A protein has these predicted regions:
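Short conserved segment of the HATPase_c
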Residues: 283-295
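Conserved catalytic submotifs in the C-terminal HATPase_c
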Residues: 196-197, 216, 221-230
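Short alpha-helical segment of the dimerization/phosphotransfer core of two-component systems
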Residues: 167-172
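Conserved micro-motifs of the catalytic ATP-binding
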Residues: 187-193, 231-234
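Sensory modules in modular signal-transduction proteins
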Residues: 1-34
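PAS-family sensory/regulatory modules and their coupling/dimerization elements
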Residues: 44-112
Length: 354
């Protein structure tokens, strides 16, 4: 295998660079990374505006022996044209044995891995916080029951304490169940689905029945606009969970009476489209990009009163994606919020032909 074919087979952006900063050659992935057709003979400093990245490259040149390091950059002027956020990079370098000493540099964009690891760290931190709160309450009330002998001296107060502990133990169970559900969806995706043809109306009926007490308390109206024979191919358990989370979320987020929530479904030439629309207070525009993140909660004047695990919409997104679908959200403050689920019809055609 010649040098050029070897470089193309690396699977990484590869840039042998001379000490003066001149690029000796570059493979296709390096050209894609810098969005340039011709890199050979050019200087790195002429290609990269980000002084942080140039600093790391220069440090690799100035260091005797091989260098391996990972670093993050502000993304505004990073290679690849990313305009916001953070990019993460892995740099390896070594000195050649050729008469003209070159510092070979292997530069990789590892942003996706960085973000995945960051998400895991955030999840552990958030999960620990969410679990600690009800556990602390339960332990505190148990200590009072044991130390003050309340069961005998004040049975009424003791029953109240037990009720609080039961409520928080239920919250713990809900968090754990939601975490397990997300874990299943992310690890197995389609492998965990028990797919079959089913009527979507049966899922909606189940959801409305389970949420009827909240609907009545909120003085809200629940509507369904789906043909009776409308069928989906998928796991009815997860579709029921998706619709339950979306409708429950609409009911919980809106405190004023008169709310209307509508679940509708229709077919386009290319997709099945399911929408959940509510006529409530809406969602601030700045919150929309983060809405499906784990434990994210929209900040409102009554957000502290809303009970939940903070995982409901994350479960919705992953369950929809497990069915090859996509979900988006749009919101007009004080008018309506619409969650739109799109599932390609190709998925159903393939199943019917199988």
């Amino acid at each position: 295998m010649d040098k050029r074919r070897f470089l193309e087979a690396l699977g990484e952006a590869f840039l042998p660079i001379r000490p003066a900063g001149q690029i000796v050659l570059a493979n296709t992935l390096a050209k894609e990374l810098f969005q340039e057709e011709r890199l050979e003979g050019r200087k790195v400093g002429a290609l990269v505006c980000n002084q942080e990245l140039l600093g790391h490259v220069q440090e690799a040149f100035d260091t005797d022996g091989p260098v391996t390091k990972e670093f993050t950059l502000s993304a505004a002027n990073s290679p690849g044209g990313v305009q916001n956020g953070i990019t993460a990079w892995h740099l390896d370098s070594a000195i050649t044995d050729t008469p003209i000493k070159e510092k070979r540099i292997l530069l990789r964009n590892v942003t996706q891995n960085y973000l995945t690891n960051q998400m895991r760290r955030d999840f552990v931190a958030n999960a620990s916080h969410e679990l600690r709160t009800p556990l602390t309450i339960i332990v505190g009330y148990l200590e009072n029951l044991m130390e003050d002998n309340l069961m005998e001296e004040s049975p009424g107060l003791a029953r109240k304490f037990i009720g609080v502990m039961h409520q928080n133990s239920q919250r713990l169970m809900n968090i754990i169940e939601d975490m397990l559900m997300i874990s299943k969806l992310e690890s197995g995706h389609k492998a965990i689905l028990k797919e079959q043809w089913f009527h979507l109306t049966s899922c909606v009926d189940d959801v409305f029945s389970r949420l009827d007490s909240i609907r009545e308390k909120k003085q809200a109206a629940l509507h369904m606009n789906i043909p009776p024979d409308w069928e989906l191919y998928g796991d009815p358990f997860y579709w029921t969970q998706v619709l339950f989370n979306l409708v429950e979320n609409a009911l919980k987020q809106n405190t004023e009476p008169g709310l209307s929530v509508t679940v509708a479904a229709a077919r386009t030439p290319e997709a099945c489209v399911i929408t959940v629309t509510d006529t409530g207070v809406g969602i601030p525009a700045e919150s929309l990009p983060f809405l499906f993140n784990r434990f994210y909660r929209v900040e409102t004047h009554h957000s502290s009163e809303i009970k939940g695990t903070g995982l409901g919409l994350s479960i919705v997104k992953r369950a929809v994606e497990a069915h090859d679908g996509a979900i988006t959200v749009s919101s007009t403050p004080h008018r309506e919020t619409v969650f739109t689920i799109t599932i390609p019809l190709k998925r159903f055609r393939e199943e019917k032909e199988a």
